[in-house]
Design a protein with these regions (language model features):
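Sec/Tat-exported extracytoplasmic proteins
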Residues: 16, 20-27, 36, 65-73, ...
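N-terminal presequence-like segments and adjacent domain-start helices
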Residues: 1-13
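Short edge beta-strands and adjacent turn/loop segments
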Residues: 20-52
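Mature extracytoplasmic domains of secretory-pathway proteins
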Residues: 43-95
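Generic detector of well-ordered alpha-helical segments enriched in charged/polar residues
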Residues: 10-17, 59, 63
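Polar/charged, Gly/Pro-rich intrinsically disordered segments
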Residues: 22, 78-139
Length: 139
């Protein structure tokens, strides 16, 4: 049954995993995990790899995953806007976004992570390999 926000979470997590942990589409991915944490207003994404990819590839994949997560919610509840080129979409934009991309086999060692980024609620910028420091240089 749908939750108070009109979302069948069990279905959403199944679809999310089926799409973004598909090794035919994304041969580098080992597992995708995400969680919505209302208590501190975060959605956290943990994208674990079976091989090394570049920071740019990791950032593009992470941006795609975040938008895709929102759009899976949009498919269930059109009250939330779909993602666009310059928005993560209506559901995700209400939350701070945390994302990390790193190798699964050494995920506990933060130094091995390819990317770690936090994007404040309501703000849009693509995920960046250098986190928020890198984006201010672009103008």
């Amino acid at each position: 049954p749908p939750s108070a926000d009109g979302i069948v979470w069990e279905q959403l997590w199944e679809d999310f995993d089926e799409i973004y942990a598909d090794t035919d589409a994304y041969p580098f991915i080992e597992t995708v995990n995400a969680g919505v944490y209302d208590e501190d207003n975060f959605i956290r994404f943990y994208l674990l790899l079976n091989t090394t990819i570049s920071g740019e590839e990791a950032a593009e994949y992470a941006t795609e995953v975040i938008k895709g997560f929102n759009d899976l919610i949009w498919e269930q509840n059109h009250d939330y806007a779909r993602s666009t080129e310059d928005s993560y979409g209506g559901y995700v934009s209400r939350y701070n976004i945390y994302v990390m991309v790193g190798p699964d086999d050494v995920k506990d060692n933060r130094e091995t992570w390819i990317l770690e980024d936090t994007i404040p609620a309501g703000e849009y910028r693509p995920v960046s390999p250098g986190g928020e420091e890198e984006t201010s240089a672009e103008s």
